[in-house]
C-alpha cells in the first residue's frame, strides 16, 4: 500500500516538476489528493481489520483482554503513523 501511494505521488510529481511555470500546479494538487486518499483508505481498512481481530480474540479469551488491548493500541498507532507520513509527503509537495 505504501509503495502504491509513493508511486502515485512520484509519477504525478515528476511531470509537474518538469513543467514550465504554473502548468503543473494542478497535477501536484491531483497527485497529493490521490496519495492522501490511498493512504487514508489503506489505514482505515487496516485499523478496521485490527479492531475486528482484537474483538474476536477478546471474545474467545476474556482473560487476555488487557494484553490484547495493549497490542491493539500499539498496532493502531503504527497504522496511523503511515497516514501521518503520507500527509507530510503531500504537504511537502504542496508547499515546495
Swiss-Prot record:
F(1)F(0) ATP synthase produces ATP from ADP in the presence of a proton or sodium gradient. F-type ATPases consist of two structural domains, F(1) containing the extramembraneous catalytic core and F(0) containing the membrane proton channel, linked together by a central stalk and a peripheral stalk. During catalysis, ATP synthesis in the catalytic domain of F(1) is coupled via a rotary mechanism of the central stalk subunits to proton translocation. Key component of the F(0) channel; it plays a direct role in translocation across the membrane. A homomeric c-ring of between 10-14 subunits forms the central stalk rotor element with the F(1) delta and epsilon subunits. Keywords: ATP synthesis, Cell inner membrane, Cell membrane, CF(0), Hydrogen ion transport, Ion transport, Lipid-binding, Membrane, Transmembrane, Transmembrane helix, Transport. Belongs to the ATPase C chain family. Its main location: membrane. Pfam families: ATP-synt_C. GO terms for molecular function: lipid binding; proton-transporting ATP synthase activity, rotational mechanism. The keyword Membrane applies. The record marks 80 as: Reversibly protonated during proton transport. The chain crosses the membrane at residues 26-46, 68-88. It comes from Oleidesulfovibrio alaskensis (strain ATCC BAA-1058 / DSM 17464 / G20). CDD domains: ATP-synt_Fo_c. F-type ATPases have 2 components, F(1) - the catalytic core - and F(0) - the membrane proton channel. F(1) has five subunits: alpha(3), beta(3), gamma(1), delta(1), epsilon(1). F(0) has three main subunits: a(1), b(2) and c(10-14). The alpha and beta chains form an alternating ring which encloses part of the gamma chain. F(1) is attached to F(0) by a central stalk formed by the gamma and epsilon chains, while a peripheral stalk is formed by the delta and b chains. It is found in: Cell inner membrane. Coiled coil: none annotated. This is ATP synthase subunit c. GO terms for cellular component: plasma membrane; proton-transporting ATP synthase complex; proton-transporting two-sector ATPase complex, proton-transporting domain. It is a multi-pass membrane protein.
Amino acid at each position: 500500500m505504501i509503495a502504491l501511494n509513493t508511486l502515485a505521488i512520484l509519477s504525478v510529481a515528476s511531470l509537474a516538476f518538469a513543467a514550465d511555470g504554473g502548468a503543473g500546479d494542478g497535477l501536484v494538487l491531483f497527485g497529493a489528493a490521490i496519495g492522501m486518499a490511498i493512504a487514508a483508505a489503506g489505514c482505515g481498512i487496516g485499523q478496521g481489520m485490527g479492531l475486528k481481530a482484537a474483538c474476536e480474540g477478546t471474545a474467545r479469551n476474556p482473560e487476555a483482554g488487557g494484553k490484547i488491548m495493549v497490542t491493539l493500541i500499539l498496532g493502531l498507532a503504527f497504522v496511523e503513523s503511515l497516514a501521518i507520513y503520507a500527509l507530510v509527503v503531500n504537504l511537502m509537495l504542496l508547499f515546495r
